[in-house]
C-alpha cells in the first residue's frame, strides 16, 4: 500500500443513526491524539476509574461550566494501534435522541484540537494506518446498508478479507508473469528461453477467474440493490390490488375508478435473499387530466429503468386493443411478464377473449389479486428470475467501483492477446500486463493516490 502522511488532527462524529424517538442508545466517536484528553475534559467520572486501554468507564458529560450534566454515559477507551482507526479512540455512549447527542458533540467540537469528521473518515484512517484493507472498509459500509441477509453475508465475507485475498492472488500471478518476461528482456543471454505457451495459458486462466468475478458482480448488485419490478397496464386492471397482495400490506389505494393511481408507489419483499421492489405505476392511457398525464410520464421513465416489467390485463374482459397498444410501448430490452388478473370473475368465454399468441407465451401467469389464486405461479416465476439460482454459490461480489477496475483489467488482458497474435516483441507484452496489475492494485488499495481515497470514502456515511 502507498504510504500517506499520518493524520495529526483529532476528529469526532455521531457514529449511530439518530432520529427523534428512535433508538435508546447513541454513540459519539472520537479518534486522534487528543481523543482521550478531550474526553477527560468533558466528563465527570466518579471514584477511581482506570483510563487505560480497552476499559469501559461510567460517568456524566457536563456542561462547559462543569456544574450541570448533559447526560449519563459510558466511555469506551481504545488506545492505538489497537483500535478501529489505529489511533487513540474514545466512544461515548449516551441515551438516544437528537438533543443529548448533539449537545455532547458540540462540547467535543468546542475544543480547537478537534474537528468534525468527514464522511467515511474513520474508515479512511483505518485504511491509511493499515488496520483495514480498502475492500474491507468498503464491505463494512455495505454491511451497514445491507437490505437482506444475503447482502449482509456477502459484506461479512468482504470484511473477512475474501475479496482482498482473491484479487491479490490474481494480481500476484500477473506479477509473476511480468517478472518472467522482464527478466528475459534484461538478461536474455543468462536465462533459459521464455516459455511463451505457459505465459499465454496462465493469462487465459487468469481471464477465466476474473470473468467469473465480473459475472458474479451482476448477481451481487441484485443482492445489494435488489430488483425493480414495474407493474403496468391500462387503468383499473388491478395493478394496485396485485401490489398489495404481493407485499401483504395496503400500499396502494384500490377503487373501481380508472386512473386512481397517479403517483409512483413502491413496496419491497425479500425473495431468496434478494430485495424485490414492486413499483405500482399510473395506468397508461390517453387522458386530458394534467395530473394523470404527469403520472403517466413518470410511469414511462420508471419502465425504462426496471429490471422486470409485469404487464397486467383484465383476464375476465379479455385482451383489448388498449392492452396491445401498451405492449407495443414497452421497452424491448427489459424482460416482460404478462399477468392476466381477475381470474375470479372469468367464465367459459373468458379464455376465448385472449389471443392465442398471448396464451402461448411462456411468460404468462393467470391470477386473482382478490382471492390469491395463481399467486404461487407468479412467485415461482419471480424466484426463477431472482431466486436461489442467482445467489447459490455466491460468496464474494465486487461493488461498482471494483467492477469497473476488474473490467479495465480484463480489457488490458484482452489487449495482450492481440499482442500474442501479432507476434510482437516481449516489450509490448509488458505494457498491458503492467497496466492490468495497476488496475488490480487500485482495486485492493495497494496502488492508490490520496485523492482517489478521498473520493471513495466521501460516499460513506458520517461516523463510519
UniProtKB/Swiss-Prot annotation:
PROSITE patterns: G_TRME. It is found in: Cytoplasm. Its cofactor is K(+). One of its GO terms (molecular function) is GTPase activity. Keywords: Cytoplasm, GTP-binding, Hydrolase, Magnesium, Metal-binding, Nucleotide-binding, Potassium, tRNA processing. Mg(2+) binds at residues 240, 261. Its EC number is 3.6.-.-. GO terms for cellular component: cytosol. GO terms for biological process: tRNA methylation; tRNA wobble uridine modification. The keyword tRNA processing applies. Residues 226-387 form the TrmE-type G domain. Belongs to the TRAFAC class TrmE-Era-EngA-EngB-Septin-like GTPase superfamily. TrmE GTPase family. HAMAP family: GTPase_MnmE. Homodimer. Heterotetramer of two MnmE and two MnmG subunits. Exhibits a very high intrinsic GTPase hydrolysis rate. Involved in the addition of a carboxymethylaminomethyl (cmnm) group at the wobble position (U34) of certain tRNAs, forming tRNA-cmnm(5)s(2)U34. This is tRNA modification GTPase MnmE. It comes from Prochlorococcus marinus (strain NATL2A). The gene is mnmE.
